[in-house]
């Protein structure tokens, strides 16, 4: 049934609109904070609305980069970046500390500066540009966790570099070095010095490395080719985590990020990773979205909830605040593809023929796959 209609660019734009339009009324007066609820998290309350603000960028940025727009949002974000990074503003986000949640959130801002500077940098006044640049550089003075967080300084300093701002090349090199040290083979990384092999591999480590592969293709062609090769290998294993109905394994941390489970496939399209046909990849992504949207994942105001198939605080981590689920918007990186990209015209196709049993050695997992369900044994 999924291939019966044309899932063109407009289909994905409409999905994104459905997710972000209900948020518009919840921004602070200057736009730097997004207030979505009253549950707490393991970090400072003042960072919670900043997280909400930043995470929506995972969806808006590729929309803007691909030539799209949702009325009013680019103005909110230019104003919000100005206020959030101005120490004299009442909406200032505050400085950083070791292990700060804001390190995660400035990665989304950096993504925006890399892909959509016309919306997030060029409209800013000279003073606002100086403040934003200084704010991002301030984060360079702090150590980040030795896991997927190592890629945040990489994105921050790539963004600064792309805007001809002072940046720290050492932090880019060191982050990429650490990423290489996490590599296990067959496309798999570990998320730091740990046994964790969960969705942070596709929606964090691969996701960031594929952004790098796209934006640094001319500056660092060898490494970019390597990142794409690893993603190709990973895709052949990760596909086993999805069943023919679009559902993915309920496994590991941060399950409230829901359809971020498909972000890897979207990032492969963005970075021109050639592994399965456009039709197969479109089928995986579309079935996944359709499956999610059949479930009550938003509240009655259209805001994504903490939970999984339905609102459920038992499915949260200590670091999940009301804005956290918008990490799921990473799945929309495919909107950065130009309108004429062949993906938009491709027909959604079913999964290819997969083995009934598959040993994913680096993931320490055996998958039993019979089409309409995937079961993992770990």
Question: What are the roles of these predicted feature ranges?
Answer:
Residues 2-51, 75-80:
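Low-complexity, Ser/Thr/Pro/Gly-enriched N-terminal "stalk/linker" regions
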Residues 46-52, 58-63, 77-266:
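Aromatic-lined, polymer-binding surfaces characteristic
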Residues 235-262, 268-316, 320, 339-364:
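Non-catalytic carbohydrate-binding regions of carbohydrate-active enzymes
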Residues 272, 333, 372-374:
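Short, glycine-/Ser/Thr-/acidic-enriched flexible segments
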Residues 327, 333-336:
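Long, hydrophobic alpha/beta structural blocks
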Residues 366-370:
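Short acidic-hydrophobic surface loop/beta-edge motif
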Residues 378:
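Conserved small/polar residues in nucleotide/adenosyl-binding loops
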């Amino acid at each position: 049934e999924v291939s019966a209609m044309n899932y063109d660019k407009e289909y994905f734009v409409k999905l994104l609109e459905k997710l972000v339009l209900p948020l518009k009324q919840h921004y602070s007066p200057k736009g730097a904070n997004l207030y979505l609820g009253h549950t707490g998290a393991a970090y400072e309350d003042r960072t919670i609305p900043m997280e909400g603000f930043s995470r929506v960028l995972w969806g808006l940025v590729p929309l803007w980069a691909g030539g799209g727009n949702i009325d009013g949002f680019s103005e909110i974000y230019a104003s919000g970046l100005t206020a959030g990074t101005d120490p004299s503003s009442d909406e200032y986000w505050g400085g950083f500390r070791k292990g700060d949640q804001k390190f995660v959130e400035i990665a989304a801002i950096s993504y925006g500066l890399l892909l959509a500077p016309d919306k997030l940098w060029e409209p800013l006044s000279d003073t606002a540009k100086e403040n934003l640049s200084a704010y991002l550089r301030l984060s360079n003075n702090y150590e980040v966790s030795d896991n997927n967080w190592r890629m945040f300084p990489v994105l921050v300093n790539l963004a600064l570099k792309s805007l001809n701002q002072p940046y720290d090349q050492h932090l880019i090199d060191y982050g990429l070095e650490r990423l290489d040290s996490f590599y296990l083979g067959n496309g798999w990384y570990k998320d730091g010095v740990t046994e964790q092999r969960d969705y942070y591999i596709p929606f964090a480590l691969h996701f960031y490395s594929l952004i790098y592969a796209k934006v640094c293709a001319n500056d660092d062609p060898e490494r970019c080719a390597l990142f794409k090769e690893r993603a190709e290998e990973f895709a052949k294993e990760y596909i086993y985590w999805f069943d023919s109905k679009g559902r993915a394994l309920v496994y590991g941390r941060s399950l409230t990020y829901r359809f971020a489970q498909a972000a890897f496939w979207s990032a492969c399209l963005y970075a021109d990773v050639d592994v399965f046909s456009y039709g197969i990849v479109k089928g995986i992504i579309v079935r996944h979205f359709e499956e999610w949207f059949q479930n009550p994942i938003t509240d009655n105001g259209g805001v994504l909830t903490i939970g999984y198939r339905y609102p459920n605080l038992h499915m949260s981590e200590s670091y999940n605040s009301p804005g956290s689920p918008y990490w799921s918007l990473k799945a929309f990186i495919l909107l950065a593809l130009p309108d004429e990209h062949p993906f938009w015209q491709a027909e959604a196709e079913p999964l290819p023929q997969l083995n009934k049993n598959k040993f994913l050695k680096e993931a320490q997992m055996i998958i039993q796959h019979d089409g309409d369900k995937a079961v993992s044994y770990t």
